[in-house]
Amino acid sequence: MKTIELFKFMISAKSQTPDDGGLLDFIQNYLDDFEAIRVDVEGVKNLFLYKKFSQGDHLCFAGHVDVVPAGDGWDSDPYIATERDGYIYGRGAQDMKSGVAAFVQAIKDTKHFNGTLSLLLTSDEEGEGTYGTIEVLNYLRDKSMLPDFAVVAEPTCEMVFGDAIKVGRRGSINGYITLRGKQGHAAYPEKSINPINLIAPKLANMAGVDLDNGDEFFSPSKFVITDIRAGMQVTNVTPNELKMMFNVRNTTLTSQKEIREFVEKNLEDLDYDLRLTQGSYPFKTDTKTKLVKNIDASIEQISGIKPKHSTAGGTSDARHMAPLGIDVIEFGVINDTIHAINERTTKDEVKKLYEVFKHLIDTWK
């Protein structure tokens, strides 16, 4: 089986999160000369394969086989790899069955490596992610088996293949504000305390405000209001309280402390509660490490392009690796149709991705 054939086969597996569509069993059998560890938790399937070729570094390729729901409106069956107009269409074509197929085949074709090669796959990345990659990493940590370096094959390229790798990600902090007032009749506003009136003049100083200036790798942390609601959906009663939710994709320059201080500064004269939760923490891999230098060289060798180092976009499972001391980057195909109707990629991109990963493995030292 070659890369494109493997890629098409993977698309045909209906692996809507957290279902793996049988892919983890298939891949385990496909790489039957690798040692296998299964860490299946609460219905989530996780697979770790490893093989020590020689003394040296431990390099891991990681990803997920689950996909988001396909939805309606596709021009072809989202679970049949369909070639049309120079593209291969199917759910997961970009995110991220192309990446998984590329590194699985690259590993399959490897006879020699300067160290240990491994593969980490989960069926729970697009969903909650609670019992996915993090469970495998915790197991490996307890067994002193964590990799030194990791490549997550998420789709990272923006305009052309090879133009970007992720060397980090912003964190994500969610905020929940409850602002208290005093309910009353709309005809007698002087007898009530309307929380809508209280918050209205404050919003201009909060919505969309940059909380830091960012740096050469991170765009500024921005205060993004995502929901405001109050009242009982009637016209003659003013609300007793208002609830507001917000999100901050934070850099390493902004933490919960700075966000709390920002809210307190703007709402200091109001009666409110604030709750913050950390969805993920920001991280950045040193761009001078062996991993970044080697992947840059492999991408440039195959694509002729020197990739930029980016931290843009949402979160990925790489966020679980960095805090454990693993040098991690992300690299994959163009990401312009991820989670979209008629998701697609090209044969050329998938083949080149395989070649990049194979070159990285073959030249690692």
UniProtKB/Swiss-Prot annotation:
EC code(s) of this entry: 3.5.1.18
Pfam family, one: Peptidase_M20
Alphabetized InterPro entries for the sequence: ArgE/DapE_CS, Bact_exopeptidase_dim_dom, DapE_proteobac, Peptidase_M20, Peptidase_M20_dimer, Peptidase_M20A
SUPFAM superfamilies: Bacterial exopeptidase dimerisation domain (SSF55031), Zn-dependent exopeptidases (SSF53187)
Purpose of the protein: Catalyzes the hydrolysis of N-succinyl-L,L-diaminopimelic acid (SDAP), forming succinate and LL-2,6-diaminopimelate (DAP), an intermediate involved in the bacterial biosynthesis of lysine and meso-diaminopimelic acid, an essential component of bacterial cell walls.
Family the entry assigns: Belongs to the peptidase M20A family. DapE subfamily.
UniProt name for this protein: Succinyl-diaminopimelate desuccinylase
Taxonomic source organism: Sulfurimonas denitrificans (strain ATCC 33889 / DSM 1251)
